[in-house]
């Protein structure tokens, strides 16, 4: 998407299909606040945009590209394991966009795969019963884009409630500007931040 107007049209289209602001934010890789801002047509007024859209379609269209990114993520995980002397039992992918990367990392590292689906209304999410369980596992959490960190925080909380231990979060792109969440280290392949502006 090349313009704010196009983002607005896409957000409105998704809203008209019944998606919540949170679901739209996940689909468009924007914060919930930015989606609310777009849908309220605040962008028509003077003012600076307070978010960065991150699109990775060029990576996602081919499995070979996803596995290339997963190799980098696996290398980061091994680096953290060695640096901080911890072991990993399982790789957790946050639905939807964290799952392809987590699947490939799980394969490359020969670790169990856990799939987590966050609840769009910020309630407790759930772990898919078709994949590995959480209890007693040391877990690396993988997602594509972290805007505010709320989804990661909820995932860490839910992992803990289920008897697991989150030992690391690995993100394709982070807008957060933090090195840990709830005491769990966060590593990202890319970090974004807005500089300057009005």
From Swiss-Prot:
Q: Keyword Ribonucleoprotein: yes or no?
A: no
Q: Which UniProt keywords apply?
A: DNA-binding, Transcription, Transcription regulation
Q: Which SUPFAM superfamilies match?
A: PRTase-like
Q: Does the keyword Cell wall biogenesis/degradation apply?
A: no
Similarity field: Belongs to the purine/pyrimidine phosphoribosyltransferase family. GfcR subfamily.
Give the domain section of the comments: Contains an N-terminal DNA-binding winged helix-turn-helix domain and a C-terminal regulatory domain (or effector binding domain) resembling phosphoribosyltransferase (PRT) domain.
Show the PANTHER family listed in the entry: OROTATE PHOSPHORIBOSYLTRANSFERASE, PYRE-LIKE PROTEIN
Put simply, this protein is called: Transcriptional regulator GfcR
Q: Which organism is it from?
A: Thermoplasma volcanium (strain ATCC 51530 / DSM 4299 / JCM 9571 / NBRC 15438 / GSS1)
Instruction: Please state the gene responsible for encoding this protein.
Output: gfcR
């Amino acid at each position: 998407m090349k313009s704010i107007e196009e983002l607005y049209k896409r957000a409105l289209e998704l809203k008209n299909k019944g998606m919540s602001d949170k679901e739209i934010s996940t689909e468009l890789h924007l914060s919930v606040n930015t989606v609310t801002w777009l849908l309220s047509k605040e962008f028509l007024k003077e003012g600076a945009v307070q978010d960065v859209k991150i699109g990775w379609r060029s990576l996602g269209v081919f499995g070979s590209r996803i596995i290339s990114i997963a190799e980098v993520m696996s290398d980061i995980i091994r680096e953290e394991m060695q640096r901080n002397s911890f072991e990993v039992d399982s790789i957790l992918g946050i639905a939807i966009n964290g799952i392809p990367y987590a699947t490939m990392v799980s394969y490359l590292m020969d670790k169990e795969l856990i799939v987590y689906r966050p609840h769009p209304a910020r309630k407790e999410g759930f772990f898919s019963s078709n994949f590995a369980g959480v209890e007693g596992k040391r877990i690396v959490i993988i997602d594509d884009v972290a805007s505010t960190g709320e989804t990661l925080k909820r995932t860490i909380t839910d992992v803990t409630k289920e008897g697991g231990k989150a030992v690391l979060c690995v993100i394709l792109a982070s807008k957060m500007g933090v090195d840990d969440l709830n005491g769990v280290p966060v590593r990202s392949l890319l970090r974004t931040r807005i500089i300057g502006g009005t």
